Amino acid sequence: MKALDEPPYLTVGTDVSAKYRGAFCEAKIKTAKRLVKVKVTFRHDSSTVEVQDDHIKGPLKVGAIVEVKNLDGAYQEAVINKLTDASWYTVVFDDGDEKTLRRSSLCLKGERHFAESETLDQLPLTNPEHFGTPVIGKKTNRGRRSNHIPEEESSSSSSDEDEDDRKQIDELLGKVVCVDYISLDKKKALWFPALVVCPDCSDEIAVKKDNILVRSFKDGKFTSVPRKDVHEITSDTAPKPDAVLKQAFEQALEFHKSRTIPANWKTELKEDSSSSEAEEEEEEEDDEKEKEDNSSEEEEEIEPFPEERENFLQQLYKFMEDRGTPINKRPVLGYRNLNLFKLFRLVHKLGGFDNIESGAVWKQVYQDLGIPVLNSAAGYNVKCAYKKYLYGFEEYCRSANIEFQMALPEKVVNKQCKECENVKEIKVKEENETEIKEIKMEEERNIIPREEKPIEDEIERKENIKPSLGSKKNLLESIPTHSDQEKEVNIKKPEDNENLDDKDDDTTRVDESLNIKVEAEEEKAKSGDETNKEEDEDDEEAEEEEEEEEEEEDEDDDDNNEEEEFECYPPGMKVQVRYGRGKNQKMYEASIKDSDVEGGEVLYLVHYCGWNVRYDEWIKADKIVRPADKNVPKIKHRKKIKNKLDKEKDKDEKYSPKNCKLRRLSKPPFQTNPSPEMVSKLDLTDAKNSDTAHIKSIEITSILNGLQASESSAEDSEQEDERGAQDMDNNGKEESKIDHLTNNRNDLISKEEQNSSSLLEENKVHADLVISKPVSKSPERLRKDIEVLSEDTDYEEDEVTKKRKDVKKDTTDKSSKPQIKRGKRRYCNTEECLKTGSPGKKEEKAKNKESLCMENSSNSSSDEDEEETKAKMTPTKKYNGLEEKRKSLRTTGFYSGFSEVAEKRIKLLNNSDERLQNSRAKDRKDVWSSIQGQWPKKTLKELFSDSDTEAAASPPHPAPEEGVAEESLQTVAEEESCSPSVELEKPPPVNVDSKPIEEKTVEVNDRKAEFPSSGSNSVLNTPPTTPESPSSVTVTEGSRQQSSVTVSEPLAPNQEEVRSIKSETDSTIEVDSVAGELQDLQSEGNSSPAGFDASVSSSSSNQPEPEHPEKACTGQKRVKDAQGGGSSSKKQKRSHKATVVNNKKKGKGTNSSDSEELSAGESITKSQPVKSVSTGMKSHSTKSPARTQSPGKCGKNGDKDPDLKEPSNRLPKVYKWSFQMSDLENMTSAERITILQEKLQEIRKHYLSLKSEVASIDRRRKRLKKKERESAATSSSSSSPSSSSITAAVMLTLAEPSMSSASQNGMSVECR
């Protein structure tokens, strides 16, 4: 406020403090546009007008008597009530800045920059906390304090004066007074009776200082009159009314006696009089009046216990004052006065503040208060108001056992005067007290049931309709946990001693889960519920939403898992939210802070990013458009119908660190490796979970292949659709498959026992290799192979036993599940492609896995062996132990890969197992020498160090110097490939933590992919993120194909041709044929549908390249391999590696010519060779395991591939979409149709993925070239040939400029 001597306006040149960016800075007035508004009261008639200062003669000072120019030009005497400086001042700051400001932004220099009125003491305490209620200056009485300085400046009354003023008004409030005024002609002094009311009662009339607001009994109008002209009247002191005022005077006396409001007031302001007569709460009541003018709702309510309300408020205000938090100003909420007593009762009715957890309930409280909901924060605001004003009091009342009459106000249409109301209310109170209490009790009881009843009714209805669903679900639920426990138990058992037991358990588990699976599949068939596919889920969700909700509620009531029944976005997730209505609707990014379920609706508490937290609000789920991250699938907010499978998945997702692709919310997966036992279990359960398992296994395989295809999310969804279609097709077939499974299970058990005994005798490592291939072979043959192999191997018992288990399971699975596999086979083809097609998630997984692998693999092989033994010793460390084991397997796989390359060559050429053993050491040396011959020592050294650093910057693995160690490594690698394939094939049992299994299988595959990371295959190490990794993947496929070739010995010539042709031109053909063959093998019982699918898809591009150079050689070798028998898988691996080396040597010379020849012969050989290959493969179903192993080979083939690719630069023609006729012939017409449709879909996706991959491949090629140059510059010789040398070679080959983007395309295609 201005000091009294402060001028009414400022002149140019005055030094001032002017507001600049919120702070007062020194400035000088440069120009002034003067405009002073003066409010004056004419002395003759007490009328008030506002004029400008140029119409006034006399000093411009509040209280001064001046002459004011009338409209007619005559001057009349008046008193200045108020001065307002509305001038515009342009000020210049010290630094030359200029700003035009109002007087309110200036103050005279030397004065305190903050006027007294601006201190916190002067501010109304409640204003800052009036959540959602901005400070509005329309109410003059309140506004006077919070108004701008100009008005306060010009009204020079101090705060003390203000308070005195208020006191006077308060004294007169609600009193009947006589107001004196002078008639216009100044001849007569007149008066009228009036009632003093609160200044807030009329928005239109501004009540000035020293004036009060009255309502005339004469005409019912509000008038602002000077305080000095008002005299209180009583029946004794009243002046004598004239005839005109007689009625008004009578009304005034009537009111004075009985508080009866004049009839003519009722329509306008019913509450005015009633509030004014309640003198104890005059101001509060008047405030209410003003609010209630605006809202008819409050007027209509009858307070059942007015005395109780006063008692309540009295105690509340006293409590708050004693507590040090007095309520100085009437609480306001949503522009209305807040009825604290009503709020207290409403909350009490709901069980108190602490019992109300939902924002929606608070919102209802807000509405029950009769306050219109202005914004979405209403519930939050009323909660805050309660917490501020009433929460402490509520607790105090509870502790002190203070109780109030809690009946809520009733709504009434016509209101009479307050006294009548009071009389009636007393009667009502007496009559209805008991009723009210009963009603209250019932209401409290019904609040919750009200929400629950409709749901329960629906639930009952639906349960009657579908009684079977619930029971099925329960069954499904019970089993998964059981199987989980069994798994854990099995893992913990000593692996050697309890092999057989484990297998028996597995088979029994298979039975159980098969039954479950059957039920689940029937259910799915009915409901169309493909829970594994997000899109299908969404469609199905629409149909089954209600049903799911109800069933979930029942189940969840039993489980006390109410929150879990709804699928919600997790806290912290960013989403796009619709805000506003109609044209004003906008999309904001918000993060979810909390979620809640209200009456069957999901509500989210969201924080709008970049906005103050005061804008946080609870919104309905339908306001959320989609997650901000477009890769995250949108959640349909409904209760999930938890199929056995879904529930398992959910649990696993919750407890496992990784969310797989099936998970709604995609998070980079963190995989743990399943132990061999787990793998075998997976094998057994494979068939059961054909639905979920197929998908999972496919995902896993794609991960295995390190599919780095960068495809659009659209492709993802397409793939999901395809998957959904496949699943639908398979649903029908799965039952038959299951029957086969059960029939085969007995065979499996017996076979397993035989195998286990023989395997125990033999070296388990080799047994693994042999077994994985030789399902088709007779047990004796297997034993022979095993014996041959066993001569070579020195292995840790633990590893051997694990491998043994894997191998046994592989073989048994293969033999026992031909049909199941066929079904899977189809899945695998399409699904592989599909999975590979969804690069985003898979890439993430692959990357994670690879990083893990790199770190782990970089450890020396001896370390890894130790780790393996440790892991075995501590079986309880399921995940860690498994991972360690896998790591060791990986590294061993690399080594074994090395030795295997040479060994394979020898075995293939000589076709004798013994020779293979004898020449292993030589072969290893050969491999190394060939690699070293190709690459300068410096580059090799550098590359090794590079790959090692890539593999977690750990020292390169020791070279395969120790034959025994290498052999064990080989076996390990093979085992690994087998086990992964096994795992891949085994879709996790429906109930048995499908997710953990998924994770494990994924990890296994990843590890396979990672094998290279240990150093042997830089292709895998580096490329997992790049399409080139697919090349390695393709290589694996190639190896698998090779294995298939080996299978068919008679077909050898054709196959060679086919292979060379395919490898050069149709890597895709080979892949497809391989896939088909794999399928056939699977149908015959081969164990890794997924495994091989992955390899198939990957091999198409990579393999062709490696095989070109060695067309004939590799083909013959493969044929010999097949003849080689049990060790064929090893041989295959080795042959791949050998081919890598050879390709490196020959590749540059032969590739171009080969590719030309192949392209020429291609079309012819394509169909025949494919068929022959597939048939051969069928005959030797054993070989599929080799394919499965291909992940291990993957890297090696990858090595070959790069070299071949560099020299040949040929575009692999993509006949990926061709397939073996033999496959088609074995299928029913429906199957054929679905497969063809899937192929078409894949082609479409493939085209899209190729487009994106071409670009990424170019980028990667450049990067690799750069790396190659750098490595050449810093080359150093490698101390010993280690697996990393291969990696280096692979890297170089990948990096070589000669590699055409087309060949890379092929790789990426295969990766798909």
From Swiss-Prot:
Domain Tudor-knot: 572-624
Region of interest called Disordered, as start-end residue ranges on this chain: 124-166, 266-306, 458-577, 635-680, 708-894, 909-1212, 1252-1288
Bias type Basic residues, positions: 1130-1148
Principal location class: nucleus
Region feature (Antigenic epitope): 465-473, 1130-1137
Superkingdom field: Eukaryota
Residues covered by the ARID domain: 306-398
Protein name according to UniProt: AT-rich interactive domain-containing protein 4B
Organism (species): Homo sapiens
